[in-house]
């Protein structure tokens, strides 16, 4: 018994024994030992830059059949590894991309950054860690909504039916402003992607993209720096990151990771704190029941912050330049301005704005840039519209004054629930000229609203900008946020009962939930 215990102790000690911090070089690979207490050691191919092995606490976590890498792999690259004091830097260079992997002595973290001068040929910029799904089966924080193992594809190659539930890797998404950390985990290991810098990504604070996907063969942990997934702006070049892959035994790591040491490591495109400035001020005027966000952007960078409850704000440290500055209530823009940022200083800039309509006859929803409260909005981020857990899409009739907000659909699909009907009662004082304002958040296949008020049909609006991306079926609701005004002639509205129908129109067609559609933000009738 004593002998068996001694052997077990020796085996355990050997498993967790610390090796020296450093690089072991072979003809084909660099092996990087972080000297972390929980033993993190990984191998990088010298020909492709793929991570081909990740050993954490004595256990191989890397998927054996395919590496972890940028995009779908660089194919070939010039790969070097250097050590300087307590830091090791792996550099992978192609004609248009440089990938950095950095470790600090004693830390169980692979810090990364990606510098580009052109968009990758696959049309998106992402890092994907392909890890052992037996050891790391779970996805955090949203659970199995993106676990597609053993599923049957029901839309394209990325939406699946697993048992009675629809699932997709897209259902793992979180708004950039709220996504500082996402993880995959098992009983003995947790791997988290820590994201403290989105400045070179695209889409703004409310954009969202794939975070994880357990497809069975491996569990994928992503950071999408940009993609064509409901993308609303051009891609940015330059340095993306730093972003950090953190390995732990248990517990969720802090998102407060200091990567200022990048300034001393000759990282192309890295701008240290001393070369940055800030914007501080007060936002005012918007609906105080909602979160307020201030957003800055130009062709080179983007930043954002929530304001305090009083409206005060200070931006993150920003690259110098002139920025468009936007103030949101929820996700609805209420003011736009411009500000110039200089290195080493803080610029004071206040901003004010509110939603302006008129004398409201009725309002369905709120001007928050989201389909908040509408039917199926609470589920749409995490399941397909066809899911049995969804409520009936209709067609629905909403009666002002008596219907619940959930009696109004978050989206109208040309082949599913078209049209939406609104019934309301007007007084004689409300029969004059009026405006029906229809706020939308996202359009698919040219879908846009055309309204009929009693016997009067408003003109057909022009087609919105085509983002060329599935949206509502893949858990997205935010696009360009088109708002449509219907001018209603005096006498169209009558004293008593009135009926409005809102049809989705488009020159395109499609089946069920891939038919032309749009998502509602708010509908307001005012004079």
Curated annotation (Swiss-Prot):
Query: GO terms for biological process?
Result: cell wall organization; pectin catabolic process
Task: Give the transmembrane ranges.
Answer: none
Cysteine pairings via disulfide bonds: 49-92, 183-192
**Main location, first listed in the record:** secreted
- One GO cellular component, as annotated: extracellular region
The record's annotation in Pfam families points to: CBM-like (PF14683), fn3_3 (PF14686), RhgB_N (PF09284)
EC number per UniProt: 4.2.2.23
Query: Which keywords belong to this entry?
Result: Carbohydrate metabolism, Cell wall biogenesis/degradation, Disulfide bond, Glycoprotein, Lyase, Polysaccharide degradation, Secreted, Signal
Q: Does the keyword Signal apply?
A: yes
How does the record characterize pH dependence? Optimum pH is 6.0, enzymatic activity becomes unstable below this value.
Q: Which family does it belong to?
A: Belongs to the polysaccharide lyase 4 family.
> Which protein are we looking at?
Rhamnogalacturonate lyase A
């Amino acid at each position: 018994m004593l002998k068996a215990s001694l052997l077990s102790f020796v085996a355990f000690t050997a498993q967790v024994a610390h090796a020296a911090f450093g690089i072991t070089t072979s003809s084909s690979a660099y092996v990087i030992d972080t000297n972390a207490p929980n033993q993190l050691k990984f191998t990088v191919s010298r020909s492709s830059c793929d991570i081909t092995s990740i050993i954490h606490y004595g256990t191989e976590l890397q998927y054996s059949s395919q590496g972890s890498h940028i995009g779908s792999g660089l194919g070939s690259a010039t790969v070097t590894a250097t050590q300087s004091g307590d830091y090791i830097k792996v550099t992978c260079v192609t004609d248009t991309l440089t990938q950095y992997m950095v470790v600090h002595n004693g830390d169980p973290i692979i810090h990364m950054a990606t510098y580009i001068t052109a968009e990758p040929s696959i049309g998106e910029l992402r890092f994907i860690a392909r890890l052992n799904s037996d050891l790391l089966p779970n996805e955090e924080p949203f659970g199995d909504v993106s676990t597609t193992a053993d599923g049957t594809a029901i839309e394209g190659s990325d939406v699946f039916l697993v048992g009675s539930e629809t699932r997709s890797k897209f259902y793992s998404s979180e708004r950039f402003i709220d996504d500082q950390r996402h993880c995959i985990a098992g009983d003995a290991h947790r791997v988290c992607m820590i994201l403290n810098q989105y400045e070179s990504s695209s889409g703004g604070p409310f954009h969202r993209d794939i975070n994880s996907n357990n497809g069975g063969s491996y569990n994928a942990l992503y950071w999408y720096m940009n993609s064509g997934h409901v993308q609303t702006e051009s891609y940015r070049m330059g340095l993306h990151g730093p972003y950090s892959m953190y390995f732990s035994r248990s517990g969720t790591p802090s998102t407060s990771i200091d990567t200022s040491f990048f300034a001393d490591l000759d990282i192309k495109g890295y701008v240290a704190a001393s070369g940055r400035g800030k914007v501080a001020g007060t936002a005012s005027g918007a609906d105080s029941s909602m979160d307020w966000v201030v957003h800055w952007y130009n062709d080179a960078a983007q930043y954002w912050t929530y304001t305090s409850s009083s409206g005060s704000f200070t931006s993150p440290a920003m690259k110098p330049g002139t920025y468009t500055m936007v103030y949101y209530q929820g996700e609805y823009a209420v003011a736009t301005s411009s500000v110039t940022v200089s290195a080493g200083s803080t610029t004071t800039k206040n901003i004010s704005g509110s939603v302006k309509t008129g004398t409201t006859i009725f309002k369905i929803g709120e001007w928050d840039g989201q389909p908040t409260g509408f039917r199926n909005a609470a589920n749409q981020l995490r399941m397909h519209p066809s899911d049995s857990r969804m409520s009936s899409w209709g067609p629905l009739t909403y009666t002002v004054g008596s219907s619940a907000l959930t009696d109004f659909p978050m989206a109208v699909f040309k082949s599913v629930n078209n049209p939406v009907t609104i019934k309301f009662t007007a007084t004689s004082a409300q029969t004059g000229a009026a405006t029906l304002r229809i706020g939308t958040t996202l359009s698919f296949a040219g879908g846009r609203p055309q309204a009929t008020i009693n016997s009067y049909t408003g003109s057909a609006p022009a087609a919105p900008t085509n983002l060329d991306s599935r949206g509502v079926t893949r858990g997205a609701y935010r696009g360009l946020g088109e708002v449509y005004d219907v001018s209603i002639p005096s006498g169209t509205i009558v004293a008593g009962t009135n009926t409005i129908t809102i049809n989705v129109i488009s020159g395109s067609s499609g089946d069920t939930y891939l038919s032309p559609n749009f998502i509602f933000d708010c509908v307001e009738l005012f004079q």
